[in-house]
């Protein structure tokens, strides 16, 4: 018995959660299950590997080589030296081990590490932009379901009104005030309402399936989406991830500029080597140890420096142009959305009055039909008008909330 109670306690919250979803929960699940999210970890791994490899440039670099050499006479051996037993050979086999250690590299390794970090940041921000677009797609599907829910609700209310009207007309038919064609006219409207309801429910199921793919969850037709709270933004300052992406691009260009500067400096290395070789002459030993410092300065970077700097400046201008274009287009979208919000608020005020007047006209029409002073078709027209007015008001309410969230998404607040 205890086991059954425990199972029920575990399953019931899952069932309740499955029957109700919020917009924020859908966004979070969509981000967590989006295939591209795995790229974050891959970018970090690539960055860490690159940084680790760059740091290893400070480790001693060991090389080994074996060679065989043939050469002309190294020494001018005269007859007297030959009589003393001094001879030279024209071949030599040798093996060498050499160790090099960076002492000063002009900042090249540090610049490489900065570039690795900057490149990873650019990739991170680029991925954040694509992930941010995902939120808007989820919002559109979510509000699409809410809009269909409102339409289904009003279609069901229309069916109830038509059902009451049919009972009224059938009673009038028994009293001789109405005929069978009046009953049939109401029946036709009922069938039209059923047909509309089937189409709306099918569209809702399709939207739920698409939303389920984004959040990686199978959504049944029984699931209920909670209406988000209408929000008002206090500021219109833009915090979109695109701006962070452009900033990351500029940081990468600055890191590349520092790398160009590091190529202008000389490098200093310490070295040590050990050589073992066959004797060319008896005056030489078979082995040798050596050590010292090497100062080198490659001026080849000066040849291309001017063009390299110009190239970086052009790329910086491209980033600035892209940022300005994005902000301009974003401002247009924000202005358009704010205009829609203002329009919908005005329409909602008028929608309430339209619904009130339509309901009054319908009530009077129903009384006239009972008195026989108005046709059933006129009454049906007024009933449909009430349904359309109610549906239009609900549509505007949902569109207003959607527009407010769209504005929030456009400026990322």
Q: How would you describe each model-predicted region?
A:
Residues 20-74:
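Start-of-domain marker
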Residues 25, 49, 130-244, 251, ...:
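Periplasmic alpha-helical coiled-coil/stalk elements that build and connect Gram-negative outer-membrane
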Residues 38, 61-81, 89, 100-129, ...:
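Small/polar (Gly/Ser/Thr/Ala-rich) solvent-exposed segments
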Residues 1-34, 407, 411-413:
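Bacterial Sec-dependent N-terminal signal peptides
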Residues 92-94, 140, 185, 267, ...:
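Transmembrane beta-barrel architecture of outer-membrane proteins
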Residues 39-54, 130, 134-153, 171, ...:
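Amphipathic alpha-helical coiled-coil segments
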Residues 232-277:
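Acidic, glycine-rich loop-and-beta core segments that form the ion-binding/anion-interacting portion
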Residues 97-99, 258, 293:
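Membrane-embedded beta-strands of outer-membrane beta-barrel proteins
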């Amino acid at each position: 018995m205890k086991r059954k109670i425990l199972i029920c306690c575990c399953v019931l919250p899952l069932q309740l959660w499955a029957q109700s979803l919020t917009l924020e929960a859908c966004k979070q699940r969509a981000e967590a299950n989006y295939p591209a999210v795995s790229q974050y970890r891959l970018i970090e791994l690539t960055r860490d590997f690159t940084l680790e490899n760059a740091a290893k440039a400070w480790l001693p670099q060991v090389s080994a080589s074996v060679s065989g050499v043939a050469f002309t006479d190294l020494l001018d051996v005269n007859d007297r030296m030959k009589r003393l037993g001094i001879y030279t050979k024209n071949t030599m086999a040798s093996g060498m081990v050499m160790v090099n250690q960076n002492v000063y590299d002009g900042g090249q390794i540090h610049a490489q590490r900065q570039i690795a970090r900057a490149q990873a940041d650019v990739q991170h921000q680029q991925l954040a932009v694509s992930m941010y677009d995902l939120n808007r797609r989820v919002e559109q599907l979510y509000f699409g379901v809410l809009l269909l829910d409102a339409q289904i609700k009003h279609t069901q209310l229309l069916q109830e009104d038509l059902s009451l009207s049919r009972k009224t007309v059938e009673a009038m038919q028994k009293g001789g005030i109405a005929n069978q064609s009046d009953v049939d006219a109401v029946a036709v409207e009922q069938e039209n309402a059923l047909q509309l309801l089937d189409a709306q429910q099918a569209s809702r199921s399709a939207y739920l399936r698409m939303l389920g793919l984004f959040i990686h969850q199978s959504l049944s037709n029984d699931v209920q989406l909670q209406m988000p709270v209408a929000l008002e933004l206090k500021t219109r300052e833009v915090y979109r991830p695109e701006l962070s992406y452009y900033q990351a691009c500029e940081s990468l260009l600055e890191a590349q500029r520092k790398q160009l500067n590091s190529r202008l400096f000389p490098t200093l290395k310490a070295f040590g080597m050990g050589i073992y070789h066959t004797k060319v002459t008896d005056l030489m030993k078979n082995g040798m140890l050596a050590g010292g410092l090497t100062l080198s300065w490659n001026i080849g970077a000066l040849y291309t420096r001017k063009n390299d700097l110009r190239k970086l400046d052009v790329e910086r201008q491209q980033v600035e142009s892209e940022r300005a274009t994005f902000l301009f287009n974003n401002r247009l979208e924000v202005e358009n959305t704010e205009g829609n919000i203002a329009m919908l608020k005005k329409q909602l005020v008028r929608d309430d009055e339209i619904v009130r007047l339509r309901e009054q006209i319908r009530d009077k029409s129903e009384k006239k039909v009972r008195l026989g002073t108005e046709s059933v078709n006129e009454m049906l027209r007024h009933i449909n008008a009430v349904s359309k007015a109610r549906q239009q008001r609900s549509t505007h309410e949902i569109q207003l909330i959607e527009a407010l969230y769209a504005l929030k998404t456009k400026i990322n607040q």
